[in-house]
């Protein structure tokens, strides 16, 4: 309690850090991707069950617009793509990324929009929120597609989350030097962050949180310079711990009996043997699709991943939900002449070329390789 009080006092003493409200309910920003009309105007197609799409940490709904539209078109169904609290265009508030809070935000969204039996698709951070929604509110969900994460604690990701936050905060410190009317503002921002995140794909992903315009619901706006769509000044070790966490006690004994497709990058350690065992325990009707990819599956295999998602939704919608979920054909396992994913150091696979040594936390690298 004392450390929390001291942290709040320190933040209050810094003029650029705005205090955030504590809200247990936040109305999430969203985009509905409606299926494009059929070329035959005489055919009236009624949209089927809605799909909810949940993005990853430091992401937003705008990152996945094309994929969501493709899924909507191919399944003749609306896709609701959401922004989590403190991401994209959604409101900034405490708690920042607590899984129980994020899940309740999604459940409130489903109720507010009077959606029934949704198919829920989640990637990375969104994958864990999707899993928790399926387990705690099975009456609201028909199926799930889980990409790049598992229902377990993932301490191995902490070192990389710290690197991402450190890079974004370093850019925040340089804001007065980067003017919004400078045509090279994005290149200058990239140069600041490259010291911590040399990988081009990750840099591009993180830079999607920065704009020269005033984003919606922003709490730390400065005219004339770059601005963040996230309250990055408040992202600290508590955020890192929350993202790596999983509420094991909260889901003990819970199962989701509907169909679930898990999409795994075989070069990633996010879904290891322990993760697969947890899937079997909580999601007895899950099936697995492997990709020769790291954790950034959407960046490496965008068309293939989108096809797997669409094909799964089509197939499950043809099945009678009377126990026939097991009729789903499990994708063939791909074999690679490499050690099992959980025995590999994360920095050689999931987030290439991140300078782990530049991080300020002692022992973080050992933690990542031992998990």
Swiss-Prot record:
Residues 325-352 are annotated as: Disordered. Residues 327-336 have a biased composition (Basic and acidic residues). One of its GO terms (molecular function) is transferase activity. Keywords: Hydrolase, Transferase. Its EC number is 2.3.1.-. SUPFAM superfamilies: alpha/beta-Hydrolases. GO terms for cellular component: mitochondrion. The active site is at 124 (charge relay system), 295 (charge relay system). It is an enzyme of class 2 (transferase). Probable alcohol acetyltransferase that uses acetyl-CoA to synthesize acetate esters from various alcohols. Not involved in the synthesis of ethyl acetate. Belongs to the AB hydrolase superfamily. This is Probable alcohol acetyltransferase.
């Amino acid at each position: 309690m004392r450390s929390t009080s001291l942290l709040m006092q320190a933040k209050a003493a810094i003029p650029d850090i705005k205090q955030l409200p504590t809200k247990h309910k936040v109305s999430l920003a969203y985009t509905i991707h409606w299926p494009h009309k059929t070329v035959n105007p005489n055919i009236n197609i009624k949209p089927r069950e809605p799909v909810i799409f949940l993005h990853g940490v430091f992401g937003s709904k705008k990152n996945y617009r094309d994929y969501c539209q493709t899924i909507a078109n191919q399944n003749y169904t609306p896709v609701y793509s959401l922004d989590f609290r403190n991401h994209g265009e959604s409101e900034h508030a405490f708690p920042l990324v607590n899984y129980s809070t994020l899940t309740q935000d999604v459940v409130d969204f489903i109720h507010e929009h009077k959606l029934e039996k949704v198919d829920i698709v989640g990637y990375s951070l969104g994958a864990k929120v999707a899993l928790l929604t399926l387990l705690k509110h099975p009456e609201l969900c028909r199926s799930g597609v889980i990409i790049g994460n598992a229902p377990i604690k993932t301490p191995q990701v902490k070192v990389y989350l710290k690197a991402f936050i450190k890079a974004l905060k370093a850019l925040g410190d340089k804001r007065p030097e980067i003017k919004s009317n400078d045509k090279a503002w994005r290149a200058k921002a990239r140069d600041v962050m490259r010291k911590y995140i040399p990988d081009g794909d990750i840099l591009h992903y993180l830079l999607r949180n920065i704009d020269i315009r005033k984003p919606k619901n922003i709490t730390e706006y400065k005219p004339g310079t770059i601005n963040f769509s996230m309250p990055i000044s408040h992202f600290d070790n508590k955020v890192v711990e929350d993202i790596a966490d999983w509420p094991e006690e909260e889901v003990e004994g819970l199962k989701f009996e509907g169909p679930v497709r898990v999409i795994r990058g075989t070069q990633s350690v996010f879904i290891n043997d322990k993760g697969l065992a947890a899937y079997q325990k909580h999601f007895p009707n899950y099936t697995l699709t492997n990709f020769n990819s790291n954790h950034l599956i959407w960046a490496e295999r965008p068309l293939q991943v989108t096809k797997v998602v669409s094909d799964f939704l089509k197939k499950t919608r043809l099945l009678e939900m009377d126990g026939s979920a097991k009729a789903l054909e499990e994708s063939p396992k791909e074999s690679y002449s490499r050690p099992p994913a959980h025995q590999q150091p994360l920095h050689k696979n999931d987030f290439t070329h991140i300078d782990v040594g530049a991080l300020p936390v002692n022992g973080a690298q050992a933690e990542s390789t031992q998990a």
